[in-house]
Amino acid sequence: MNECGEGAPLEAKHQVLGPPTRDMAEVLFLGTGNAFSPPGRMHALALIDGAVLIDSPPTVLPQLRRAGVSPSDIQHLLITHWHADHTFGFPFLLLDREWLAPDRDARKTLSVHTRPGGRERLSKLCEVGFPGSLEDALRERTVWNEDESGILKGTGWSYDRFPVSHTPETDPHGYKLIHGSGLTILHCGDSGPCQEIEERARESDVVILEMGVPDFVDSPHHHNPSQVISFSARHPHAMVLVTHNFSRSLDSDSGFEVPELPDEIHQLNDGD
């Protein structure tokens, strides 16, 4: 087990429920693939209650549109780390919000939650990608937040950011999301097995876990199927949802075969 930093039932496809006394939360998985976008999968992307977006992959705009979601409706963007498949869509997201907003006279503010240095990195992407087009959006309609925990205003959610085991140069982190009803979702970002995830999983209803590599790859930076199975066995109370998948989708013919996982583990597909 690596040191880091160096159960709720599923309703239909994507409605995550706590116990009967809790409110319903909607989680849309707009993409479930790893950085290689395996056949039938776009880059991993999750949207909570239509307002909280976790990461911004290069294809974020078609992913949102396919789900019938307007980029202007996103209130909060949570960045897990700096890898391109998690951040290179940021200029496109901002471009749409700035120039194709339903009401350009009432363009909305986006709260971006990152680690220190995020403002500089993401602003540079915008300057290189669309010079002269996004300066006002970055200055006037983007709120930058480097706090490690806080309230996601207007959503009913709060968050706690924590370090995970991934490529150190990307400053990798996950997010523990707590709803006002008590429902807890642990989004682990990109990470291999690590103590920070283990400790938080014990008190989480739902765990969104990546499975970025096949079993013949033993990497400290990603989970493989065997490690996902072991994780689920250690935390039988939690609903384990698998994303950032190395394998093809069920209806694709090429790419790595979809691994067999126990029924209690939900191996997600795009659109779930």
Named regions from a protein language model:
Residues 106-171, 259-271:
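Metallo-beta-lactamase
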Residues 192-272:
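Cap/insert and terminal regions of metallo-dependent hydrolase folds
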Residues 36-38, 116, 139-202, 206-213:
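Active-site-proximal loop/helix segment associated with metal-binding centers of metalloenzymes
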